[in-house]
Each structure stands twice: as structure tokens, then as C-alpha cells.
A protein has these predicted regions:
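Alpha/propeptide regions of enzymes that mature by internal proteolysis
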Residues: 6-218
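Extreme N-terminal basic, low-complexity initiation segments
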Residues: 2-4
Length: 218
């Protein structure tokens, strides 16, 4: 069973092929992973369809946690338009993502997803191989206005049942190896460390303090 991590930077956009999904939404094929899983772009969403059973570890509010029965994972740009605010389709973020999954044509109970204000056409896809192991990262991000550093003063409070702010750095990490859940969690930590290292190499500053950013405020 192949492992996949979905969490909340380095490559070029890969042009693909276009066809029409059964919902009538035009989709573009972006990439086929070493596992046989395929990534598509559906207008403002990127969906990775699993070819077989997958161990999925996700930090998403929508169907997050550890699961072994998911069929896909998606990343969605929530902006109404370029430079415009993000759209909420329901009173809660969880229900908002459930509606999005249905719109794309997915089964909400069998997927997990992430929201962002980053443009899907700017996705970065990178695969690295060592011997029999291949790791693929599918990343969207942008922290010009929301870069933050661990330890910065909090500037946002979300009471229960209020919409969440949408995230700004989203990573889908696919590992073509069968790992126990604890090792998969360790890989997620290493992925987070790599994200922070990439941000600091860019010398991106926090918008809430004088230090370098370690991630986004969301």
C-alpha cells in the first residue's frame, strides 16, 4: 500500500492534456506519479486520483487524520477572482469543502481536501528518486501578505462554527513506499521542516515580527 501525505516548492508547471469530466468540468492532466496516481486541474482545483489503496495522513479540517479508504485528495483556490476575496459556500469550513468535493464530482466521504488563496495554474510539481523510492511534491503557495514565524503573536481567533481563513501553503506529498503510520507521521514532520527551509532560503520575512518567516499565518 502506497503512502500519501496531504498537508497545510520547487519546479515548473507541467503542461498536460485536456478532456471533460462527467460533471462537464474541463480538466487538464498535470502529472502521473510513480505510483500510477494522476493529478488533474479542474479550473480552480487540483485533484489527485489514487490508482489503488493508499495510506493517507492529512492535517486538513475536512476529513483529516489517518485513513486507508480514500480515493482522492484535492486542493482548491477559494478566490472569487484574481485579487478578490475567498468565497465560502457554507457557514462552516467543513461543509464548504464538502460542497466543493461534490461540485468536482468526488465522494465527500472518501476524499480529503485543502483550501488556499493561491492560483492553481502556479502549482509546482517535483519528483526525486533514490534507488527504489520516489517522492513527489505537489505544491501551491504564496506568503507575501501572510508570512509568519513560529512564536509570533497571534492575530486571529476563530470561535467554534465560524468560517476558517483559507491556507496559503498547501503540499500534497506522495511516497511510493509502504510505511507504518508512525513513520508516515515522521515524514510529515520532515516535509514541514523542508517547507520552512525553503522559505528561509528565500529570506521571506514575517508580517507579524522582525524575524524570517517559517510558514504562513494560516
Amino acid at each position: 500500500m502506497t503512502d500519501m501525505i496531504g498537508i497545510k516548492n520547487i519546479s515548473v508547471f507541467l503542461p498536460g492534456q485536456e478532456d471533460t469530466f462527467f460533471t462537464g468540468v474541463v480538466r487538464m492532466k498535470l502529472y502521473t506519479v510513480s505510483t500510477g496516481d494522476t493529478a488533474y486541474r479542474y479550473e480552480k482545483s487540483i485533484v489527485v486520483f489514487f490508482k489503488g489503496a493508499r495510506k493517507v495522513l492529512s492535517t486538513s479540517v475536512f476529513n483529516g487524520g489517518y485513513h486507508e479508504n480514500y480515493k482522492a485528495v484535492f486542493n482548491h483556490d477559494g478566490k472569487v477572482g484574481s485579487g478578490m476575496p475567498c468565497e465560502m459556500l457554507a457557514d462552516t469550513y467543513t461543509e464548504h469543502m464538502r460542497i466543493l468535493a461534490k461540485r468536482i464530482g468526488l465522494e465527500p466521504e472518501l476524499v480529503t481536501g485543502m483550501g488556499t488563496a493561491a492560483d492553481m495554474e502556479n502549482v509546482a510539481i517535483e519528483s526525486l528518486t533514490y534507488k527504489e523510492l520516489t517522492v513527489t511534491a505537489i505544491v501551491t503557495g504564496g506568503i507575501e501578505t501572510n508570512g509568519g514565524r513560529v512564536g509570533d503573536p497571534a492575530d486571529y481567533y476563530k470561535p467554534a462554527e465560524k468560517p476558517d481563513k483559507l491556507g496559503t501553503i498547501n503540499i500534497i506529498l506522495i511516497l511510493d513506499a509502504d510505511m507504518p503510520p508512525g513513520t508516515l507521521a515522521r515524514a510529515l514532520v520532515t516535509c514541514t521542516e523542508a517547507k520552512t527551509a525553503a522559505i528561509q532560503e528565500l529570506l521571506a520575512g514575517s508580517n507579524y515580527s522582525t524575524g524570517l518567516a517559517t510558514g504562513s499565518g494560516t
